[in-house]
Amino acid sequence: MGHVVLSTPIVTMFVVYSLLMLYIGFYFYKQNETTEDYFLGDRSMGPVISALSAGASDMSGWLLMGLPGALYVGGLINSHIAIGLSLGALINWVFVAKRLRIYTSVIANSITISDYFETRFSDDKHILRLISAFVILIFFIFYISSGLVSGAKLFEATFGIQYNYALSIGTLIIVSYTFLGGYKAVCWTDLIQGLLMMSALIVVPIVMIIHLGGIGEGIKIIREIKPENLSFLQGSSVIAIISSLAWGLGYFGQPHILVRFMSIRSIRDVPKATVIGISWMVISLIGACVMGLLGVAYVHKFDLSLEDPEKIFIVMSQLLFNPWITGVLLSAILAAVMSTASSQLLVSSSTIAEDFYATIFNKNAPQKLVMVISRLSVLGVACIAFFISTDRNASILSIVSYAWAGFGASFGSVILFSLFWSRMTRIGAIAGMLSGASTVILYDKFGKSFLDIYEIVPGFIVASVAIVVFSLFSSVRAGTKEAFETMLKEIESLKH
């Protein structure tokens, strides 16, 4: 089982939803006067939009397909991923958001993460900008690819069309509104998509539980056929648990999430956004975990077959609801895919347009030209990600985990040290980025045969050690300590 029975209501809901997203892109097309408008929405995003946009762009199709699939296969042991992510997101909002917002707006007008690194360490040679830009492009191409795979699997299962055709349709929709609308379009669509995703992850598990005859009945069935799925620890090692919890480390280095902190309307909006964002996340993660866990019981009770565990949400949406509701629920997967891929495309395009073209190759480029370059970059990055996504057997979770580790190791430690340690230097930042990224790449290829731990763990540790060692053996550049003190004063002023 895996193909949805094609019907007019399902097709209608998909078309309506896609047209709504494209309309938002067209609406904001003429509102983008500057690169700050296009990339940060003129720093005018309120707490609700900032919170839900951060959540929706963070989770992607992984939330509705990858995570439920992992719980379906491995049970509660895989819920450690959700726990790690929740803790990481909370720490990110509480400790990183305010400081990064101050640094990128009050102290310096930084539009991109690479911008921030350059101004934070007074890097007049643009080395940090170039390294971070390369890291962003390399890992985001894989990350965007995971979203395109999710979208393709959705269209393939929904419409029964060939994978490559499904991939083309999903890519075209995502690229279109990102190309036109920029950051405001992405954030407003994220608001809609975030609410739709959470609603779907509340409704589907509840209806599943009702059809099973209650949670107790579902657990009873699982205990009979697959009891190991009910254990948080059984059948797993300490290394596996550490690997799952370590997903939380990735939050500190995700450019498409960090940029939400940079664009929020006011520093005083951060606490409210934190409550909204974490509440959305916890509810959505619980829903995804419950659906994946109880999916085993449902499939067994009603004598069904499921070829691809990552399609459990698609199958449940088809079986439990009428076609109109199914169309809405399946649009939630499209929403998840679109929200993340569009954010990542936008960050990638800003990297090419701002960090390469406008800073290195044409410093006097007019704003309109930079925006043209950024829109062309959206197309270019999407084409490369599309090519990688043509492997229909690729696991959504495995692609996401690789890119997540890459950003967490190369940027996460640098972001944390740069915001909390005034003694950190430009050389330390360079060493941290290079060692973190290279450790993830090399460990993924060669290290797992020695110790099968999630590559973000060694990557984050190596990067942190490199930052401390190289910073202690190099000097702090003029002005950086003063800027750090200014940031601390701004933080202190918020308490009064």
Model-derived features: positions:
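Membrane-embedded helix-loop-helix hairpins and adjacent transmembrane boundary segments
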Residues: 1-496
